[in-house]
Each structure stands twice: as structure tokens, then as C-alpha cells.
């Protein structure tokens, strides 16, 4: 079983159009929507929602753009005086032990869920820059998913794998391997929360180890390594039609590759 998910619907019009195109003419079968951006186009999203075989979920975001709060809290630990988010994964990890920060975060996540529900019923939850994977934050997300009847929360266990391409052996890939180890270790704790709240999740993901290098090869070899014994594997990509963003444009082209679909189907029949 496999899910091929486009994160970041709503981050730009070019991303939105790439996601729509790849859902119609490619192998994309899922997306995650950022609702706190000026580019969250609900007309395009409705076309995706009209496809009964396409998953639409919520991409929780405290990394960039603005909070949905109408009244800003003075001296917020979550956003600046203009309501803008400027959080890195590292800064959020550090603040995730602060009760006041977690209370603010829960309120902002709740606002994003309720904004999504005005337009669609999310089938799953994940987050921008994997911030919901941080264990103290994951607990909040699972609690909210249960409260709002959202059945699936992404976890981030990725089996390290290698592909026959020397270009992939770079400093960036080594950094990504560290991310894989960190997120996979978090998943060991996070799956207990999944069980506690009776939620669903994936068994594996593909997309962290080769971030910025996702193409037909990395997708194929990633699924070959991670989708075994009927386990559910979710690939995450960030496609765009903006050719200046070469890595993301390459992901878009990969999603339109019919040969890749045939290869993935053969893997599932093993």
C-alpha cells in the first residue's frame, strides 16, 4: 500500500497547480493543505475534493506566514508582534518543554483545524517542517485529531536506503540522514500516542533522507526499501510548476512519470 502526498498546498499558486495537475495526470493521490497562507485557493482545492480517490488533509504550520488569531498575545513565544511565525525546528524543539508555549501552540493548531473545517473535512494531519513529530507536540496533535474526528496522523519512520547514483552522496544527504535518525527515534514514542487515541498512521515514510533530491529514482528505491509485507508507506513531496525552483520542479515532473507508476505497482505485487 502506498500514499504519495504533496505537502504545502497553499504555499504558492504554482504549487497548487502542480498538485492539481499531478492528481489528474500523474501518480499523486494525496495532499496536505496549509490554511494560514494567502495562496490557499479553495476553488482549486475543490477540484481535488471532488476526486473520491484523492486524500486531502491538513498541513499544520507554525513555521511561516501568520497566526489565525484575531487578537495577538503580547510577548508571544510563538509569533512576533505582527503575528508572523519565524520558528525553526530546533527552536520549537527547545520550546516544546515550555508549558506556556505548548498552550499557545495548541490554540493556534486548533484555529487551523477549525479554519480547515469551514471548507473541507481533513482526512489526515501532518505539519510543515515535521514540527508535529516533536513528542510533546505530537501529543497535542493526537488529542486534537481525536477531538475533531480526524482519523490519521503522519509519523516519520524512514528505513535508510541507498540508490545507485553518486550525486546523492553529498553533505546534504548526510545531514538528512541525521534528520532520519532523529525523526525515527521520535516515532517510537509517538506511536504510543497513536495507539492511545485509536488513530491510524503510516508504517514508513519516504522523503526525508533525500529531501531536495526526490525524483523517480529516489521514489522507486525508497518504496522498494520501505514498502514490505503490505505495510503502508507514505512518500512526501513538494511539487511546483515554478521552474526556477529546480528541485521542486523535478519532483513535479517525477509525479507525471507513467513508468514510475508501473514500477510501484509491480513492487506492491511482490
PLM feature spans:
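Active-site histidine-anchored catalytic micro-motif
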Residues: 127-129
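Conserved strand-turn element in the central/C-terminal portion of the radical SAM core barrel
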Residues: 132
Amino acid at each position: 500500500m502506498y500514499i504519495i502526498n504533496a505537502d504545502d498546498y497553499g504555499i504558492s499558486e504554482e504549487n497548487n497547480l502542480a498538485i492539481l495537475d499531478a492528481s489528474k495526470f500523474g501518480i499523486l493521490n494525496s495532499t496536505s493543505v496549509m490554511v494560514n497562507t494567502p495562496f490557499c485557493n479553495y476553488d482549486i482545492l475543490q477540484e481535488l475534493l471532488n476526486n473520491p480517490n484523492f486524500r486531502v488533509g491538513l498541513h499544520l504550520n507554525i513555521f511561516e506566514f501568520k497566526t489565525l488569531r484575531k487578537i495577538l498575545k503580547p510577548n508571544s513565544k510563538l509569533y512576533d508582534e505582527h503575528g508572523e511565525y519565524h520558528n525553526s525546528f530546533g527552536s520549537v524543539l527547545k520550546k516544546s518543554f515550555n508549558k506556556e508555549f505548548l498552550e499557545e501552540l495548541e490554540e493556534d493548531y486548533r484555529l487551523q483545524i477549525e479554519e480547515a473545517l469551514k471548507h473541507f473535512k481533513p482526512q489526515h494531519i501532518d505539519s510543515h517542517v515535521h514540527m508535529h513529530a516533536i513528542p510533546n507536540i505530537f501529543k497535542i496533535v493526537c488529542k486534537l485529531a481525536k477531538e475533531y474526528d480526524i482519523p490519521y496522523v503522519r509519523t516519520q519512520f524512514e528505513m535508510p536506503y541507498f540508490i545507485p547514483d553518486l550525486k546523492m552522496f553529498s553533505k546534504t544527504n548526510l545531514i538528512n540522514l541525521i534528520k532520519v535518525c532523529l525523526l525515527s527515534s521520535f516515532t517510537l514514542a509517538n506511536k504510543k500516542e497513536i495507539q492511545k487515541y485509536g488513530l491510524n498512521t503510516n508504517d514508513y515514510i519516504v522523503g526525508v533522507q533525500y529531501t531536495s533530491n526526490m525524483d523517480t529514482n529516489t521514489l522507486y528505491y525508497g518504496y522498494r526499501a520501505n514498502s514490505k509485507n503490505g505495510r503502508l508507506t507514505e512518500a512526501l513531496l513538494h511539487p511546483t510548476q515554478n521552474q526556477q525552483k529546480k528541485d521542486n520542479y523535478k519532483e513535479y515532473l517525477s509525479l507525471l512519470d507513467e513508468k514510475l507508476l508501473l514500477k510501484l505497482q509491480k513492487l506492491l505485487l511482490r
